């Protein structure tokens, strides 16, 4: 301060240097006024700087590698696969004869005491018998077939879970790549805004600008800091989802995605729609349920037929009497009222499952068409952004910087050009994310694999 005061005293001795003194003191005041926000910006950028170093050190992981890892490790897929394996054991249980029954019988005569009358009556005996129930021919086969169809539906559900998890993996991976690229855009524009702020300070210090321009630039820099902080939060959320799908420890190293780039769709809308019935996993699951219900209706029809039981018993008497041998054959007479209700229920279930499949198909077809329109529109928009809007905005800001530096344009025009560059860059990345997300959804709906 003594050095500054001394210099000011010397300059005041000469009337011709009064203007220089005013400019010098103005620069001191303005630098002290805006030192705190700049220091905050520097401190706030330090975590991002360390994150950038991690991104530079780590290597991006291709999406295909993560998909293969998810197929092996995803807990949700493991649960569905275990359920499918368990369902395969139902058919042998349903298609096997009922358990045989064995009987040991003792018949007393003249007294409730065991073996009473055994030696003096030919009615007293010790019997050993066995019996077996036989369902009407075809019932066991149909019961096993129904169980097989149940297992087929559970197996089809495995593919539903698999495709759902892969779609979640893809969309989260794309969103993480979007955050990574938009974060770079925010940092680049923060540097550009700092350049604009410095020029605004220079204009303000020379009396050609006003303090409002400087404060407005600093406010925008603070907003960028907020956006960067929100990006860090979203990155952490995406990392948690990816590690859950891959069954990695949540404190393991972060996954670095490859840069997001546009993949143009080579299928026509009609080709995608044609693949829905044959390749959509939800439609296939509904088809398996239709087959199951059809087989259950056949079984309900067969339940009108009676079941049979055969039993045989050997009855041993005393040596002086002859033994007894008894063969029995029995048949049940099914009550028709509950059987008719069961058959009607099975037939309604067939209609219901067919209606569910039709509703599912129509919903998928509509969603495929919707996503197809989104993809084609975003492809056009990406070209407009890449070849038109963004280059024009960049040329405008460069011309504006040059003009503002030489005081040939005002701050508002320059700031508007800067906001155009920032918003168009972010809009391009958002459109690119929407495009890739729609492609992942198309893959899930139609069953196609896109490059």
PLM regions and their residue ranges:
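Bacterial N-terminal signal peptides
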Residues: 18-31
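Small/polar, glycine/serine/threonine/aspartate-rich low-complexity segments that form flexible
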Residues: 43-60, 103-134, 143, 255-266, ...
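Amphipathic alpha-helical coiled-coil segments
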Residues: 79-94, 161, 165-186, 195, ...
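A glycine-/polar-enriched beta->alpha junction
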Residues: 68-78, 85-100, 128-145, 156-163, ...
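Acidic, low-complexity, intrinsically disordered peripheral segments
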Residues: 2-7, 11, 21, 34-55, ...
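Periplasmic alpha-helical coiled-coil/stalk elements that build and connect Gram-negative outer-membrane
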Residues: 2-3, 16-18, 46, 161-277, ...
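Bacterial Sec-pathway N-terminal export signals of envelope proteins
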Residues: 35-101, 106, 133-134, 250-291, ...
């Amino acid at each position: 301060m003594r050095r500054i005061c001394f210099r000011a005293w010397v300059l005041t001795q000469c009337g011709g240097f009064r203007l220089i003194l005013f400019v010098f003191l103005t620069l001191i005041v303005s630098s002290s006024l805006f030192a705190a926000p700049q220091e905050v910006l520097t401190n706030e950028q330090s975590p991002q700087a360390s994150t950038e170093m991690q991104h530079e050190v780590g290597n991006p992981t291709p999406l295909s590698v993560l998909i293969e890892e998810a197929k092996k490790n995803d807990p949700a897929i493991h649960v569905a696969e275990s359920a499918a394996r368990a369902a395969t054991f139902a058919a042998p249980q349903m298609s096997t004869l009922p358990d045989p029954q064995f009987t040991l019988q003792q018949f007393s005569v003249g007294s409730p005491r065991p073996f009473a009358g055994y030696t003096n009556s030919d009615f007293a005996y010790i019997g050993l018998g066995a019996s077996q129930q036989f369902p009407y021919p075809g019932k066991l086969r149909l019961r096993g077939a129904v169980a097989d169809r149940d297992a087929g539906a559970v197996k089809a559900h495995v593919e539903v879970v698999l495709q759902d998890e892969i779609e979640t993996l893809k969309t989260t991976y794309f969103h993480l790549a979007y955050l990574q690229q938009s974060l770079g855009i925010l940092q680049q524009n923060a540097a550009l805004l700092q350049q604009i702020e410095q020029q605004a300070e220079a204009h303000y210090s020379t009396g050609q600008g006003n303090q409002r321009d400087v404060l407005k630039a600093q406010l925008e820099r603070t907003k960028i800091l907020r956006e960067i902080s929100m990006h860090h939060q979203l990155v952490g959320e995406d990392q948690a989802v990816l590690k859950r799908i891959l069954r990695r420890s949540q404190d393991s190293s972060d996954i670095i995605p490859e840069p997001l780039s546009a993949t143009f769709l080579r299928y026509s809308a009609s080709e995608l729609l044609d693949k829905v019935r044959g390749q959509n996993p939800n439609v296939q699951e509904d088809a398996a349920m239709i087959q199951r219900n059809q087989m259950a209706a056949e079984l309900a029809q067969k339940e009108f037929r009676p079941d049979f039981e055969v039993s045989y018993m050997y009855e041993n008497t005393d040596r002086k009497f002859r033994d007894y041998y008894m063969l029995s054959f029995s048949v049940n007479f099914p009550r028709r009222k509950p059987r008719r209700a069961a058959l009607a229920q099975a037939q309604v279930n067939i209609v219901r499952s067919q209606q569910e499949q039709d509703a599912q198909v129509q919903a998928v077809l509509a969603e495929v068409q919707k996503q197809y329109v989104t993809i084609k529109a975003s492809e056009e928009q990406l070209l407009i952004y890449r070849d038109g809007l963004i280059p024009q905005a960049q040329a405008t800001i460069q011309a504006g910087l040059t003009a503002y530096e030489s005081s040939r344009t005002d701050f508002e025009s320059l700031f508007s050009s800067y906001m155009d560059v920032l918003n168009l860059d972010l809009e391009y990345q958002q459109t690119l994310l929407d495009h890739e997300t729609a492609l992942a959804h198309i893959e899930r709906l139609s069953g196609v694999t896109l490059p």
